[in-house]
Amino acid sequence: MIDERDKIILEILEKDARTPFTEIAKKLGISETAVRKRVKALEEKGIIEGYTIKINPKKLGYSLVTITGVDTKPEKLFEVAEKLKEYDFVKELYLSSGDHMIMAVIWAKDGEDLAEIISNKIGKIEGVTKVCPAIILEKLK
């Protein structure tokens, strides 16, 4: 499927998607054109789905980041998930087979904001039975 050079390209781009192809080429000992072709092939295979940025929530005034478990009535699972997608404070959303049916990454300005989000927004969605936020203390990786 992919070879060792492709894996290295992916590792480099995962750390910094803006790494110039010339720099990648030097690290791999191949031409910039070869890197360009490899990246294009990785995109066409769907291995690279897109490029993104990392945002520091604290710099935007969000002092709390949570991973929040949301449980629902089984028949309301997808409706609740669709509603959660609409909220700007939900930054990532996953269906889960673990302790909770839905897992959401939520940004909140402070404890009061988080309480408002949990009680008056998520908690009021029809079909939600339980909301369990876990505040992230430090991102390690």
From Swiss-Prot:
Any single Pfam family the record assigns to this protein: AsnC_trans_reg
SMART domains: HTH_ASNC
Molecular-function GO term, any one: sequence-specific DNA binding
CDD domains the UniProt entry points to: HTH_ARSR
DNA-binding region range list: 21-40
All copies of domain HTH asnC-type, residue ranges: 2-63
InterPro entries from the UniProt entry: ArsR-like_HTH (IPR011991), AsnC-type_HTH_dom (IPR000485), Dimeric_a/b-barrel (IPR011008), HTH-LrpA_regulator (IPR053456), HTH-Siroheme_Decarb (IPR050684), Tscrpt_reg_AsnC-like (IPR019888), Tscrpt_reg_AsnC/Lrp_C (IPR019887), Tscrpt_reg_HTH_AsnC-type_CS (IPR019885)
Superkingdom of the source species: Archaea
Gene3D superfamilies in UniProt: 3.30.70.920, Winged helix-like DNA-binding domain superfamily/Winged helix DNA-binding domain
Keywords: DNA-binding, Repressor, Transcription, Transcription regulation
NCBIfam families: trans_reg_LrpA (NF040820)
Comment on protein domains: Consists of an N-terminal domain containing a helix-turn-helix (HtH) DNA-binding motif, and a C-terminal domain of mixed alpha/beta character reminiscent of a number of RNA- and DNA-binding domains.
Subunit description: Homooctamer; tetramer of dimers. Forms a homodimer mainly through interactions between the antiparallel beta-sheets of the C-terminal domain, and further interactions lead to octamer formation.
PANTHER family to which the protein is assigned, alphabetical: HTH-TYPE TRANSCRIPTIONAL REGULATOR PTR2, TRANSCRIPTIONAL REGULATOR, ASNC FAMILY
Record function comment: DNA-binding protein that negatively regulates its own transcription. Interferes with RNA polymerase (RNAP) recruitment by inhibiting the association of RNAP with the TBP-TFB promoter complex. Binds to a 46-base pair sequence that overlaps the transcriptional start site of its own promoter.
Protein known as: HTH-type transcriptional regulator LrpA
